[in-house]
């Protein structure tokens, strides 16, 4: 699933070489923390958060074993 997320993000941003995805897992589900070039934050989040919500929906639909998937985008000031 991490590869899928990195592939989607790579197509959205202008600086694909600066994508950093950190994955952690526990009994509640899987957490992906995304860090990108500050210029690409708007492209990842989208208008009114629509793009990041679509990414979250895709990851939850692709999740195996019905595990929840959480996605946080970090902007240098912490997760959002």
Where are each of the predicted segments found?
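RNA-contacting regions in translation and RNA-metabolism proteins
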Residues: 1-41, 51-54, 58-80
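Glycine-centered tight-turn and secondary-structure capping sites
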Residues: 45-49
């Amino acid at each position: 699933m991490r590869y899928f997320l990195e592939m989607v993000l790579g197509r959205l941003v202008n600086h694909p070489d600066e994508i950093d995805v950190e994955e952690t897992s526990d009994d509640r589900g899987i957490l992906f923390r995304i860090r990108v070039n500050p210029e690409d934050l708007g492209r990842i989040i989208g208008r009114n958060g629509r793009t990041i919500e679509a990414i979250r929906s895709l990851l939850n639909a692709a999740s195996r074993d019905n595990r929840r998937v959480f996605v946080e985008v970090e902007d240098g000031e912490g997760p959002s």
